[in-house]
C-alpha cells in the first residue's frame, strides 16, 4: 500500500488546515504585540491578566453551553469516566471497552502499518469533529446573544472613550493619550473574547459565499490582525497600534444595527409577530442614525486640547448636533445648518442615505405583507452552478429534516429548493436547522398542478437541478388519485427537463409505478415498503431498526443520554453496543481492478480478515446465470406436480426458442471452452405411448451424403416440418457440419400428432418426406428409423462439437415454401426424394471467426437459448456470442437497471469489471479507498517484492489466470494455450464439427462421478413416470388405453354433468395418489358391478386424456375446483345437499367410515349452513370467543393470533402480505368498518370487533392476552393539524396495552408490539420516565431524528412513514456509494434470523469452540450463510436492542438472535 491513500482532496485539506491554523496563530501573536506596543498606557502583567481573563470567560461560557445546551462527545465522555471512577465502576467498563469501538476501526486497520498516515488520519478526524462543533457553537443562539452583549459593552466603552479624544482641527488625527488605563484593560478583555470567536470562524470556515454575506463576519474581519496592521501602518498612523480599535469603534454601532435589523424572531406569548417587526423598525432607525452620527463625528468632529472645563457638555452638544444632522439627512429634509466638510464625510453621507432608502422600504414592505397577506417565499435562489436538490410536492417538515441531515452527514452541503403546497410557517424549525448548519434553503409556496407555470420553474433554475424528488400527499383518501396528481407533476417536469432521467417520484400504490418506469424515472412506493417492513418485523424482530441503521447516515453517541441515577449505568453497555452497531452502513462500490477475476468466496474472506468488512453481494446490470439458484420444491402429489409442470411448459413454449445447452459442471470437467453440448427440450404430453407402456423420446436424424461430405440435420422436436424448415447446403471440402434447425414461429400442439409430414432417413442417405399418418402406421415395422438417444450418443461420443445455430434467410424460405406447397398438393406422392442439392445451401462464413462460450446452468440446472442472428446483406450466418462467468463484459448496456444478488457463497461466482460490491462497513473512507486505490495487492496477501522486473498489474493478471486455469481439465491445457480472461475464444477454421447432444456425456461418463444428488437427480424422470402409471396398471394395457385416448373428445368444463364427472375424477385421483390400491369409486345410486368397472375405465381414460391431451382445459378446471373445494371444505355454503352427500359417501367408501357418523356430520353441516350464509354478509363480532366459535374453523383455532387496533383503508394489503399462507387468525379492533371484499375476509381469516372506546375491558375482550402479535395503527388524518392528536391517542393505547400485559400476562415480550406514528417527534411520549429528559436535552442528531434515543426504537417497536424516507435519501445524488433500489428489495426478501439455541442442530457446533462473533461468522460462512448482526435482550431501561456487525471479540449469549443472509 505505497499509494492510493493520499488524494488531491487530502492534500488540499492539509494545505487548508495549515493555512487556518496559521491565521489563528497570527491573530494570537498580534494580540500579544498590541500589549507589547502599548507599554506606556498598559502594564504588561495587567494586560496579560486581562487577556487570560477574557479567554477563560469565553471558554467557560462555551463549556456551560456544551454541558447544558449541547452534547459534545469529548467533554461528556471525560465527565462520564470521572463519575464512573467515583463509584468504582470503571473496571467493568474497561472489560467491555472492546465492544464500544471507534466508528473508523476499519480505517485504522487499513493504516496500522503506516505511522505518518495514521497520524494524518487521527488529525483529520479530530479536526472534522472540532470543525462541526465549532460551527454549531458559532451559529447557536447562545453565542448570538453573547456577541450582541459583547458588542454593546464595546459600544459603551467606545462612547466613554469619546470624552477623552482630543484634536484641534478635523485635518489632524485624534489623540488618545488621555484615555485611562481601565478602558484599555476592558478593551483587552473584549478583544480576547472576540479572538475566540474569530478562531471558531476560521476553524468552521467552509462556505466562503455564505460567510461573506454575514454582516457580523464582515465587521469582525476589520478587527482581525491583518486588517488592523494595514490600517495602523498605512492609513492611520498611530504611536500605539491598539488605538486603531478606538478609531474604528463606530463599526460596532453598525454591527449592532445589523444584528437588530436581522434579528431572529422567536415565538412568544407576550408580543405578536407584527408588534416585533414594528419595534425592530423603530430600533433600526434609531441605531442607523446613531451609527451615522458616530461615523461623522469620527471624521469631522473637533475636541480641543485647551478645554479643561465643561468637557462633557462640549462633547455632548457636539455629538447631538451630528445626531440631528443624521436625522435630517436620512429624512431628506436638509436644512443646511450642518453639512459635510470634506470628501470622506460626503461619501459617508451618500452611503448612509442610500442605505436608508433601501432598508426602510424593505422593512415596511415586510410589515405590510405580514399584516395583510401570508408569506409565500423564504430564502434566496441559488443562481450559480452549485448542485442543488429540487423538492416538489407535499413535503412535510420531518421529511425535509431527513434530506437536510443527509446532506450534513455526507458532507456535501447541497442547496435545497422547495416547491411545497404547505404554508411556510410550518418549516420554522427546519429553517433554524438549515441556518444552524449553514445549508442554503429556498422555500416557495406553490402548487405545480394548479397553474402549470413553467416560468416559475425557469425562475428557480429548475432545469439545472442535480436531482428532483416529487412527493405525494398522504392526508387524503384514494391513493390512485394522489398518485395521478403526482404523476401529472412528473409529466410537467418531464416536458420541462427535455428527457433528463434525474427524477424520483414517491407513490402511494402500484397503480402508476409501471408507467413511471416506462418513462425512465425512479419510483418509491412508500406504503408497500412500510407494509413489507411491518410484516418482516413481526416475523423477524428488530428488522425495522436494522434496515434503518444500514441505510441512514446518523451516528449515535452515548453522551446524548442523561443518566441521573445509579440504576441507569447497567444500561450503558447495551446502549454502547447499539450505538456502535448504528454506525454500520451499507455501501456499494465499483470493484477494483485487482479484484476482477477473484471468486466471490475468496474476496469475501479476504475483506473480512484484512479490513473487517462484510461482503454481502454484488450489483450488476448483466445477465448472470450463476446467481440465485432456487431449489426445486417437492410436491405433495403427482397431480399438483403435473399441473405445475404443464403450466410451466406452456409458458416456456411461448417465450423461449428451440435449443438449450448442457450443465456447466459437465463442461468444466469434460468439455472444452470452444465446445458445447446440445440438450434437447423435454417433450411432455406430446409423446406417443408404445405398446410396452413407456414414453419414448424419438429422434429422427437424417444424413445427406455427397462426395464424402456429411451433413447431419437435427430438429428440436424430432420432426422437421417441411412448411417451416428451409435449408440450403453447399459442399465444403473435408468438412462435417452439424445443423440444428430452430423454428422461429412455433406451432402450438394440442393433438397427439402435431404435424402431418415427417422427414425420414433411408439407408441410401436420401431424405424422404412422408405424412405423419403413414409414419404412425409403419412405426412398429420400421423401428430402425427411431434412433435412441443413448445409442446415438455411443456412436458420436468421440466427435467434437461447436455451438452453431443457424437462421435461414427469408428469401430461401419463400422459395422453399412454394416447393413445399406443391408437394402437399400431390396426395399420391408419399415418397418425395430430394435430389437437388442447390435447394440446401449452407451459408457458412469461414472468414468470420465464430465465437462461443460455455453457458452456465440457470435456476433449474437448464441452459439458456441461443438467439440466432442472420446477416441479410451477405446472406451469411452470424452467431451470437454467449458470455460466461469467465468472460469480462466490457460492453454493457447502461440502460439496464442494476440488480442485486446477495450471498453468492459456494456458487463459484467470479467478479467482473462492471460489478459493484455491496458491503456492510463502518468507515466510508475505507470504501472510498477500495474503489480508488492504485493497488490492493497487500489485501490479498501478494508479496510487494518485485520479481524479474514484472509490474504489479501484469502480476495480477498472471495470478488471475492461474486461478481460472484450475477449472479446466488437463486435456484442454494440452490442446489450447492459456489466454487471459479478457481475450475472446475463437474456433479454428478447419475444425471438424459433429453433432452431439447431452445424452452422449451421460453414456460416456458415469453419472455417479459427474453429479451428486443435490446437484442433479437423474432418477427424477423415471420416478415420475412410475408414479404416473402406477395406478393405471392391471386390467388395461397401454395400447388399448392409447387407442381409447384418440377416440375421446374434449371435455367442456362449463357443463354441469361434465363437472360432476370431473369432481369424481379429481377425488379419485387424489385418493389414488395417497394409496397403492386400484381406483374403485361407487356411485350414490345402486348400480351393478359392470357399471362400476366401466366407470373405472372411463375415469382412467379421462384422467390420462386430461393430463396428456387436454392439459389446458384441466388447468382451467383446477382453478374452478380450487375455489369450489375451498368453500366446500371450509364453509360449506355454496354446495347443495346432494353434492355434500356425494362427497361424504365417496370419502366414506374409501376410508371405511360408518354411515351413521356421516349422517350426523351432514346434519351438523346443514345446521351450520344458515349460520355461515349469514356470516358471509358480515364478519363482525363482540368478543374473541365469539369469533372463535363462529368464524374461525376448528382446524384454524390453533393458529397464532394477530390483533390489529384501528383500521386503515389499505389494511387488507397488509393482511395479505402477512397472512399469505393462512397460518394466522386476524382480529381488527376498530370503530368504523371499511368496505372490503368478503372473500378476502374468509380467505385470510379476518374478523372485526367493533367498539367505540378502547378501554381495558374492550382490549382484553378482543383477545389481548391470547394475541401473539399486536399492531397498533393510527387513524387516518384529514389534514396536517390532526397529526399530534392522533399520535397521542395511539400512544395512550400503546402504554395502556403494555400496562395490561405486564399486569395480566407473565410471559410478556415488548418486541411483539409494533406502534405506527405519523410524527416521529411524538415518540418521546412513549417513554414513561424520559419525556422531560429527552425534551430538554437535544443533540445534533435529535434535531433531525427525535426517535433515536428511544428504547422503542432500540427494540424496533415503532415505525413511521417519515423514517422510511431515509431509504429515499440513500441515493446517488447524496453519496457516491449508494446501493440500488433492488438491493433494498433483496434485503427485505432474503434476510432471515437464526436462534443461537437452535444452532445445536449442526453436529459440529458447540459453545466451547464458538464463543465470539468471529467464530460464529466463520462457522456459518462454511454453511454458505452470511452473518450480519445480533438481536439481544437488555434490561428494564433497554429491553431489546440491535447490534449490527458486532466486534470480532464480542461474546455470544445463549438467547441471542442472529440476522443472516
Swiss-Prot record:
One of its GO terms (cellular component) is plasma membrane. This is Potassium channel K2. Its main location: membrane. Residues 771-794 are annotated as: Disordered. Disulfide bonds: none annotated. SUPFAM superfamilies: Voltage-gated potassium channels. The gene is K2. InterPro entries: K_chnl_BK_asu, K_chnl_dom, K_chnl_Slo-like. It is found in: Membrane. Contributes to transmembrane potassium transport. The chain crosses the membrane at residues 44-64, 142-162, 183-203, 218-238, 242-262, 281-301, 349-369.
Amino acid at each position: 500500500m505505497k499509494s492510493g491513500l493520499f488524494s488531491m482532496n487530502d492534500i488540499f485539506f492539509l494545505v487548508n488546515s495549515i493555512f487556518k491554523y496559521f491565521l489563528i496563530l497570527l491573530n494570537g501573536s498580534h494580540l500579544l504585540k498590541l500589549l507589547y506596543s502599548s507599554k506606556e498606557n498598559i502594564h504588561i502583567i495587567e494586560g496579560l491578566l486581562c487577556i487570560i481573563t477574557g479567554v477563560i470567560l469565553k471558554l467557560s461560557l462555551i463549556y456551560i453551553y456544551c454541558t447544558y445546551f449541547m452534547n459534545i462527545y469529548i467533554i461528556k465522555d471525560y465527565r462520564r469516566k470521572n463519575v464512573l471512577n467515583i463509584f468504582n465502576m470503571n473496571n467493568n467498563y474497561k472489560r467491555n471497552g472492546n465492544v464500544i469501538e471507534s466508528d473508523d476501526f476499519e480505517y485504522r486497520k487499513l493504516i496500522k502499518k503506516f505511522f505518518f498516515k495514521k497520524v494524518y488520519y487521527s488529525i483529520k478526524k479530530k479536526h472534522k469533529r472540532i470543525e462541526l462543533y465549532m460551527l454549531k457553537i458559532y451559529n447557536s443562539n447562545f453565542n448570538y446573544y453573547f456577541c450582541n452583549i459583547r458588542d454593546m459593552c464595546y459600544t459603551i466603552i467606545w462612547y466613554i472613550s469619546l470624552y477623552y479624544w482630543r484634536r484641534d482641527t478635523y485635518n489632524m488625527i485624534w489623540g488618545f493619550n488621555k484615555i485611562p488605563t481601565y478602558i484599555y484593560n476592558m478593551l483587552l478583555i473584549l478583544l480576547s473574547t472576540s479572538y475566540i470567536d474569530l478562531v471558531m470562524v476560521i476553524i468552521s470556515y467552509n462556505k466562503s459565499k455564505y460567510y461573506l454575506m454575514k454582516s457580523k463576519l464582515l465587521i469582525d474581519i476589520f478587527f482581525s490582525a491583518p486588517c488592523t496592521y494595514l490600517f495602523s501602518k498605512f492609513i492611520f498612523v498611530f504611536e500605539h497600534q491598539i488605538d486603531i480599535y478606538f478609531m474604528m469603534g463606530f463599526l460596532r454601532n453598525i454591527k449592532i444595527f445589523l444584528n437588530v435589523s436581522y434579528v431572529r424572531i422567536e415565538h412568544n406569548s407576550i408580543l405578536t409577530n407584527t408588534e416585533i417587526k414594528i419595534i425592530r423598525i423603530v430600533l433600526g432607525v434609531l441605531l442607523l442614525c446613531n451609527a451615522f452620527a458616530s461615523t461623522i463625528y469620527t471624521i469631522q468632529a473637533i475636541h480641543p486640547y485647551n478645554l479643561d472645563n465643561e468637557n462633557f457638555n462640549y462633547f455632548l452638544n457636539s455629538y447631538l448636533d451630528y445626531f440631528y444632522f443624521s436625522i435630517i439627512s436620512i429624512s431628506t429634509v436638509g436644512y443646511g445648518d450642518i453639512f459635510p466638510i470634506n470628501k470622506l464625510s460626503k461619501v459617508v453621507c451618500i452611503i448612509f442615505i442610500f442605505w436608508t432608502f433601501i432598508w426602510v422600504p424593505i422593512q415596511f414592505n415586510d410589515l405590510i405583507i405580514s399584516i395583510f397577506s401570508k408569506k409565500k417565499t423564504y430564502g434566496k435562489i441559488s443562481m450559480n452552478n452549485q448542485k442543488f436538490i429540487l423538492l416538489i410536492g407535499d413535503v412535510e417538515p420531518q421529511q425535509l429534516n431527513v434530506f437536510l441531515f443527509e446532506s450534513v452527514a455526507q458532507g456535501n452541503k447541497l442547496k435545497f429548493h422547495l416547491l411545497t403546497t404547505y404554508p411556510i410557517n410550518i418549516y420554522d424549525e427546519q429553517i433554524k436547522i438549515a441556518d444552524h448548519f449553514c445549508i442554503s434553503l429556498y422555500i416557495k409556496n406553490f402548487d405545480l398542478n394548479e397553474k402549470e407555470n413553467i416560468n416559475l420553474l425557469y425562475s428557480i433554475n429548475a432545469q439545472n437541478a442535480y436531482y428532483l424528488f416529487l412527493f405525494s400527499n398522504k392526508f387524503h383518501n384514494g391513493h390512485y388519485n394522489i398518485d395521478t396528481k403526482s404523476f401529472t407533476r412528473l409529466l410537467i417536469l418531464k416536458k420541462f427537463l427535455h428527457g433528463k432521467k434525474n427524477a424520483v417520484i414517491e407513490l402511494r400504490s402500484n397503480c402508476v409505478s409501471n408507467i413511471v418506469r416506462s418513462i425512465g424515472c425512479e419510483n418509491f412506493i412508500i406504503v408497500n415498503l412500510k407494509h413489507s417492513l411491518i410484516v418482516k418485523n413481526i416475523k423477524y424482530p428488530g428488522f425495522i431498526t436494522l434496515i434503518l441503521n444500514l441505510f441512514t447516515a446518523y451516528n449515535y453517541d452515548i453522551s446524548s443520554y442523561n443518566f441521573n441515577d445509579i440504576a441507569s449505568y447497567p444500561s450503558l453497555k447495551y446502549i454502547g453496543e447499539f450505538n456502535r452497531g448504528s454506525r454500520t452502513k451499507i455501501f456499494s462500490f465499483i470493484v477494483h481492478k485487482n479484484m476482477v477475476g477473484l471468486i466471490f468466496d475468496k474476496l469475501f474472506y479476504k475483506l473480512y480478515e484484512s479490513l473487517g468488512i462484510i461482503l454481502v453481494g454484488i450489483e450488476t446490470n448483466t445477465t448472470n446465470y450463476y446467481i440465485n439458484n432456487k431449489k426445486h420444491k417437492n410436491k405433495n402429489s403427482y397431480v399438483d406436480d403435473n399441473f405445475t409442470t404443464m403450466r410451466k411448459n406452456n409458458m416456456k413454449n411461448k417465450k423461449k426458442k428451440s435449443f438449450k445447452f448442457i450443465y456447466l459442471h459437465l463442461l468444466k470437467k469434460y468439455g472444452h471452452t470452444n465446445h458445447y453440448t446440445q440438450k434437447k427440450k423435454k417433450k411432455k404430453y406430446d409423446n406417443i405411448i408404445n405398446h410396452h407402456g413407456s414414453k419414448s423420446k424419438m429422434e429422427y436424424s437424417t444424413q445427406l451424403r455427397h462426395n464424402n461430405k456429411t451433413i447431419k440435420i437435427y430438429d428440436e422436436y424430432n420432426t422437421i416440418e417441411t412448411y417451416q424448415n428451409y435449408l440450403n447446403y453447399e459442399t465444403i471440402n473435408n468438412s462435417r457440419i452439424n445443423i440444428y434447425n430452430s423454428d422461429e414461429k412455433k406451432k402450438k400442439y394440442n393433438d397427439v400428432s402435431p404435424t402431418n409430414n415427417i422427414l425420414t432417413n433411408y439407408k441410401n442417405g436420401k431424405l424422404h418426406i412422408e405424412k405423419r399418418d403413414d409414419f404412425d402406421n409403419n412405426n412398429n415395422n420400421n423401428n430402425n428409423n427411431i434412433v435412441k438417444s443413448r445409442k446415438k450418443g455411443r456412436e458420436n461420443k468421440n466427435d467434437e462439437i461447436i455451438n452453431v445455430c443457424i437462421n435461414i434467410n427469408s428469401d430461401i424460405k419463400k422459395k422453399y415454401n412454394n416447393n413445399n406447397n406443391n408437394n402437399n398438393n400431390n396426395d399420391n406422392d408419399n415418397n418425395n426424394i430430394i435430389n437437388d442439392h442447390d435447394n440446401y445451401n449452407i451459408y457458412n462464413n469461414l472468414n468470420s471467426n465464430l465465437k462461443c462460450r460455455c453457458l452456465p446452468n440457470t435456476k433449474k440446472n437448464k441452459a439458456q437459448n441461443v438467439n440466432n442472428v442472420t446477416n441479410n446483406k451477405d446472406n451469411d450466418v452470424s452467431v451470437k456470442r454467449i458470455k460466461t462467468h469467465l468472460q469480462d463484459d466490457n460492453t454493457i448496456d447502461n440502460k439496464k437497471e442494476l440488480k442485486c444478488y446477495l450471498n453468492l457463497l459456494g456458487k463459484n461466482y467470479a467478479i467482473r469489471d462492471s460489478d459493484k460490491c455491496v458491503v456492510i462497513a463502518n468507515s466510508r473512507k475505507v470504501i472510498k479507498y477500495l474503489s480508488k486505490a492504485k493497488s490492493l495487492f497487500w489485501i490479498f496477501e501478494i508479496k510487494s517484492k518485485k520479481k524479474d522486473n514484472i509490474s504489479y498489474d501484469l502480476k495480477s493478471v498472471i495470478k488471475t489466470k492461474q486461478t481460472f486455469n484450475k477449472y479446466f481439465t488437463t486435456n484442454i491445457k494440452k490442446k489450447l494455450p492459456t489466454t487471459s480472461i479478457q481475450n475472446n475464444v475463437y474456433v479454428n477454421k478447419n475444425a471438424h464439427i459433429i453433432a452431439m447432444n447431452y445424452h452422449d456425456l451421460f453414456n460416456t461418463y458415469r453419472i455417479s462421478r459427474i453429479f451428486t444428488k443435490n446437484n442433479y437427480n437423474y432418477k427424477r424422470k423415471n420416478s415420475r413416470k412410475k408414479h404416473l402409471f402406477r395406478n393405471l396398471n392391471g386390467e388395461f394395457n397401454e395400447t388399448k388405453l392409447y387407442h381409447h385416448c384418440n377416440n375421446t373428445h374434449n371435455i367442456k368444463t362449463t357443463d354441469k354433468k361434465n363437472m360432476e364427472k370431473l369432481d369424481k375424477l379429481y377425488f379419485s385421483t387424489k385418493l389414488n395418489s395417497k394409496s397403492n390400491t386400484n381406483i374403485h369409486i361407487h356411485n350414490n345410486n345402486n348400480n351393478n358391478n359392470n357399471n362400476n368397472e366401466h366407470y373405472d375405465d372411463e375415469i382412467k381414460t379421462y384422467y390420462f386424456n386430461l393430463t396428456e391431451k387436454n392439459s389446458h382445459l384441466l388447468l382451467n378446471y383446477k382453478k374452478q375446483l380450487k375455489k369450489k373445494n375451498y368453500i366446500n371444505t371450509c364453509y360449506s355454503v355454496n354446495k347443495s345437499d346432494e353434492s355434500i352427500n356425494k362427497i361424504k359417501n365417496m370419502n366414506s367408501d374409501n376410508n371405511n367410515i360408518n354411515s351413521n357418523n356421516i349422517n350426523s356430520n351432514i346434519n351438523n353441516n346443514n345446521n351450520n349452513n344458515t349460520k355461515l350464509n349469514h356470516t358471509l354478509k358480515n364478519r363482525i363480532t363482540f368478543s374473541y370467543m365469539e369469533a372463535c366459535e363462529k368464524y374461525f374453523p376448528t382446524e384454524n383455532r390453533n393458529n397464532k393470533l394477530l390483533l390489529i387496533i384501528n383500521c386503515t383503508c389499505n389494511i387488507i394489503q397488509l393482511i395479505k402480505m402477512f397472512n399469505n399462507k393462512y397460518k394466522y387468525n386476524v382480529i381488527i379492533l376498530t370503530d368504523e368498518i371499511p368496505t372490503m371484499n368478503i372473500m378476502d375476509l374468509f380467505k385470510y381469516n379476518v374478523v372485526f370487533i367493533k367498539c367505540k372506546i378502547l378501554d381495558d375491558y374492550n382490549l382484553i375482550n378482543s383477545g389481548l392476552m391470547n394475541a401473539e402479535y399486536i399492531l397498533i395503527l393510527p387513524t387516518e388524518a384529514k389534514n396536517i393539524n390532526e397529526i399530534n392528536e392522533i399520535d397521542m391517542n395511539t400512544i395512550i393505547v400503546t402504554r395502556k396495552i403494555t400496562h395490561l400485559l405486564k399486569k395480566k400476562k407473565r410471559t410478556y415480550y415488548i418486541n411483539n408490539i409494533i406502534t405506527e406514528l405519523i410524527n416521529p417527534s411524538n415518540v418521546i411520549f412513549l417513554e414513561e420516565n424520559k419525556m422531560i429528559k429527552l425534551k430538554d436535552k437535544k443533540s445534533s442528531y435529535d434535531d433531525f431524528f427525535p426517535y433515536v434515543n428511544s428504547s422503542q426504537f432500540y427494540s424496533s417497536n415503532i415505525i413511521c412513514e417519515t423514517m422510511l424516507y431515509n431509504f429515499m435519501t440513500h441515493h446517488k445524488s447524496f453519496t457516491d456509494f449508494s446501493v440500488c433500489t433492488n438491493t433494498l428489495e433483496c434485503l427485505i426478501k432474503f434476510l432471515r434470523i437464526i436462534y443461537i439455541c437452535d444452532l445445536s442442530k449442526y453436529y459440529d457446533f458447540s459453545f466451547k469452540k464458538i464463543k465470539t462473533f468471529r467464530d460464529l461468522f466463520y462457522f456459518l460462512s462454511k454453511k454458505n450463510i452470511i452473518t450480519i448482526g445480533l438481536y439481544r435482550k437488555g434490561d428494564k431501561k433497554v429491553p431489546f436492542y440491535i447490534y449490527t456487525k458486532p466486534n470480532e471479540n464480542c461474546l455470544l449469549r445463549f438467547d441471542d438472535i442472529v440476522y443472516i443472509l
